[in-house]
Amino acid sequence: MASLIYRQLLSNSYVTNISDEVSEIGARKTANVTVNPGPFAQTGYAPVNWGHGELSDSTLVQPTLDGPYQPTTFNLPIDYWMLIAPTQIGRVAEGTNTTNRWFACVLVELNVQNTQREYVLDGQTVQLQVSNDSSTLWKFILFIKLEKNGTYTQYSTLSTSNKLCAWMKREGRVYSYAGVTPNASESYYLTINNDDSNVSSDAEFYLIPQSQTELCTQYINNGLPPIQNTRNVVPVSLTSREIRHSRAQMNEDIVVSKTSLWKEMQYNRDITIRFKFANSIVKSGGLGYKWSEISFKPMNYQYTYTRDGEEITAHTTCSVNGVNDFTYNGGPLPTDFAISRFEVIKENSYVYIDYWDDSQAFRNMVYVRSLAADLNDVVCSGGDYSFALPVGAYPIMSGGAVTLSPAGVTLSTQFTDYVSLNSLRFRFRLAVSEPSFSISRTRLSGIYGLPAANPNNSVEYYEIAGRFSLISLVPTNDDYQTPIANSVTVRQDLERQLGELREEFNSLSQEIALSQLIDLATLPLDMFSMFSGIKSTVEAVKSMTTNIMKKFKTSNLANAISDLTNSMSDAASSISRSASVRSIGSNTTMRISTAIQTGEDLRTMTDASTQISNVSRSLRLREFTTQTDNLSFDDISAAVLKTKLDKSTQISQTTIPDIISESSEKFIPMRTYRVMDNDTGFETGIDGTFYAYRIDTFDEIPFDVEKFNRLITDSPVLSAIIDFKTLKNLNDNYGITKTQAMELLQSNPRTLKEFINSNNPIIRNRIENLIAQCRL
């Protein structure tokens, strides 16, 4: 079928007038510029592997166990436990306020009798009396002195099996742990001038907030969590704990991440939302005393306001959801006042406001995440509406009010008369407010909510102030705008029709008679005979055929054919006939990316299978240069398409161009191709299978890749309608003559029809399998 379309393209049978070009341009702008639906309304997924990046948050998430940090000297923050985890005996840490307090902590190993040891404390070498009588517990000893040149005295001890100690500055005191684990508890020593007290640690340490003192006590008595004792936990410098404070601007653009083609931009904007309700009041026929409907309608509103000195043009669409229907009937007479239905929004209702403005934030609002908004509440109060009766005093509906509170924000698309806009949809929940509404001269009163009769109360608009923030994936080039879903409804209707037509086409495969299919495949089909089953005029068929040609010219198959044609043209311009024949083959082989290599290059059967598969996918184009009088896969595809077009009940002029171009690429995807050399046949399949066999006996022989490479360059490439497996199965079970074998190898339609008419199950099954592959 593709070759049929290809040959008619080459023959220039069809032309395009200016009206066709205008229609095509309009179709591109209105129907074909679409984005695949994504998780938000009419947006789509990004065309890259898009991670969430770093998320900014105003909440300080404080870890319970912060560390470990490398040994250092620093001013320990107030209200933080410094949990020290030494790995060797000796000095653990020391500190001072530089005036009247010097303190130091040392670690003593097991089984140490009362002895003097030498330590370097406060830059001086001192002798301290230490001991540890326990054979199972390590011992921390806290020493303190009150003068620069004074003597250290023992203050408290902590015996532990976990080699952990801790202290904290709080309320003018130094707190530490004392006792014996697992019953150690905190104690304190009075000190002054905590703000200038520096601490020097000789071991790794952790910081724990005072609010987690209970957990710190648990660590002292029972040890650190298992994760902290692995070799993968690496201490870091204390400087990594520094927090840099920054204040976000109300209106700013921040580059979150950036690659060569795309970047993530965070847009922070303060906005002013102005909106108004629209309503529809319909009066019934008759004497003029009855109304059939009072309802809310969507309302578009365009306005300008100033943001940071810049004039912003904004567009909003206000709509309601979850309305409540009320009725009023004053009596059965034609002159009795009555309202068949009037709408009221109450607590169970929602108001949606779609907002768009001309700022950079909305220019590429297609791929969006981290969307948040903060808006004010607004009170909407109803006004008076007089029902003009032919005679008598007018009933007046008055009052009613609701408060709109923000309930969320999502993405949406606004459709105006000229363009569709990717916008933000702000959702508001409602709460009823005073006053209630009533209708004068009736018993209807004391009802809460906002009726649709006069929801704007003569004000020009309602206004909400607030701000929003979002992160959008946009092109790195600021001059490029990401396409949005223009006229998406038109395209969706067409896609729905195409989907239904595809289902019908696929279901019709079982209704095709095999014998008639072979006859139809041998006919010289053209485009006009293809559409003979469609009720239409000749001019309509011409127009439809032109559209099919346009669709086909933009397909992947047509592009590959164009490359092949260029190669043939280059070869035809060669000087000698023999050179041109070789040029056709070599250029074609190059264009179709023939990756066949010889001998030593084919190390494994897997390599050969991959290369053969790549060649088989491209031999379809090579087949165009060697058209024969026998059947090809495209002949069967065209016959199946013709049969299904005749049987279809849903085909139309708008859908047939898509169906034909799609069929030319998708019908019979699992094809097998054959080249022959005297008594040897070579077959390759799309699935990577390949066979070489004797034609007279169908005995398989080794596949000569070098010979195959030469044959596909110089010899005709045939469609293997009846492939090697089917032929061998047929010969083994039924026995066939050499003449029949040659005709089946060449896909002779007469021989195929004879086997089908004789109900040969093997041949019928093969043809039915090909028909089943003609799917969309």
Curated annotation (Swiss-Prot):
Keyword annotations for this protein, in alphabetical order, are: Capsid protein, Coiled coil, Disulfide bond, Hemagglutinin, Host cell membrane, Host cytoplasm, Host cytoskeleton, Host endoplasmic reticulum, Host membrane, Host-virus interaction, Membrane, Outer capsid protein, Viral attachment to host cell, Viral penetration into host cytoplasm, Viral penetration via permeabilization of host membrane, Virion, Virus entry into host cell
Task: List residue numbers at the site (Cleavage).
Answer: 231-232, 241-242, 247-248
Recorded GO cellular component terms are: host cell endoplasmic reticulum-Golgi intermediate compartment; host cell plasma membrane; host cell rough endoplasmic reticulum; host cytoskeleton; membrane; viral outer capsid
The keyword Coiled coil appears for this protein: yes
What segment(s) does the record annotate as region Hydrophobic?
Answer: 389-409
Read off the Pfam families from this record. Rota_VP4_MID (PF17477), VP4_haemagglut (PF00426), VP4_helical (PF17478)
Motif: DGE motif; annotated at 308-310
Q: Where is this region: Spike foot?
A: 510-776
Q: Where is this motif: YGL motif?
A: 448-450
Got any disulfides in this one, which pairs?
Answer: 318-380
Give the note.
Answer: This strain probably does not use sialic acid to attach to the host cell. In group A rotaviruses, VP4 defines the P serotype.
Q: What is the protein's name according to its record?
A: Outer capsid protein VP4
What is the native source organism of this protein? Rotavirus A (isolate RVA/Human/Thailand/Mc35/1992/G10P11[14]) (RV-A)
